[in-house]
């Protein structure tokens, strides 16, 4: 019986383990952590015939019988010692999405990557295809693992996959019908090392795609990739003149309409999502739908009905004229700057968490322009306070926790006549939460319990 070792006891790792076990593999799944939740999962998986090792770092010399296959969860660094050993020993080492691709490659895929904008674009593309009557499943980094989709055995017409750079590291063979690159700014450099390595990791998805769609309003993509793939479809919110290679393969805004080549598809007035960045997401999704053969009527209906996704400029409630907005997905400076741009000033900003590498200058400039006050939480609070001081901004407070931040934000909104309280952290969440979703859920619950009575 062939033996597979799965690294990472998260949703994708568990789905991969169950899929391989169903196919007759001997399966071991390991995780470097050991928590009460993981122990409960260990007990459940043991009943399914899956061995679970907790507080375990995968290394070949620790295993008397090396596995035939290693499957890596997204959170596991591709250059970790155990994985380097496995690849050097000739052991096939892949990611969960690669495993799923081997079972679903008979279906057309849309693969969506980028620093920011992935989730909204993925959800909107899926909505357009579903409105046309197709069984199009949003999966991947959006929260539903692709191996779970395989296990579900449901009918499929299209796979709509959000794919992060972490997942692309271990995804050598994926060849989507349509690939989308939403934006590119410095992020995850603690994982990828250099901007160039991060870029090339992203580029893998498009290299093997039949159709390639890029955001022509992203300065980095426009500068670095305008001549790399001549067959690219480009989008632009700035009209046909801004398309890198004209309208032959162009989707753009003109006269209040989203147009494909010269055909009006949907009026911008039907799009409810705030912010210029969401217009970019809209154009990318329309491009995918056009290439996927979706009728114009279905595209327009999906756009009109689309209400957004949680944790991306998500309106929570309004109290005394103050709107509370959850942008917990803003886990880097660029996304947090975009969140500030999307809402009217003055704003009470809640920021902080686990800091990332990156250029914070434009984010700080936007704080100076839009924020009446800033409340700092989490491990990055002192660092952010120092950076705000350095640019001459002094209306900040270190409040440490979300529970302290929400009521204080309401007080400051009254003081400064601000109509918006915005959680847009510019940080990862792992210092205080297990995910940005849990952080956003905490913010939502605190707002609703206090202000939605």
From Swiss-Prot:
One of its GO terms (cellular component) is cytoplasm. It catalyses: UDP-N-acetyl-alpha-D-muramoyl-L-alanine + D-glutamate + ATP = UDP-N-acetyl-alpha-D-muramoyl-L-alanyl-D-glutamate + ADP + phosphate + H(+). GO terms for biological process: cell division; cell wall organization; peptidoglycan biosynthetic process; regulation of cell shape. ATP binds at residues 114-120. It is found in: Cytoplasm. One of its GO terms (molecular function) is UDP-N-acetylmuramoylalanine-D-glutamate ligase activity. Pfam families: Mur_ligase_C, Mur_ligase_M, MurD-like_N. The keyword Ligase applies. SUPFAM superfamilies: MurCD N-terminal domain, MurD-like peptide ligases, catalytic domain, MurD-like peptide ligases, peptide-binding domain. Signal peptide: none annotated. Its EC number is 6.3.2.9. Gene3D superfamilies: Mur ligase, C-terminal domain (3.90.190.20), Mur-like, catalytic domain (3.40.1190.10), NAD(P)-binding Rossmann-like Domain (3.40.50.720). HAMAP family: MurD. Cell wall formation. Catalyzes the addition of glutamate to the nucleotide precursor UDP-N-acetylmuramoyl-L-alanine (UMA). This is UDP-N-acetylmuramoylalanine--D-glutamate ligase.
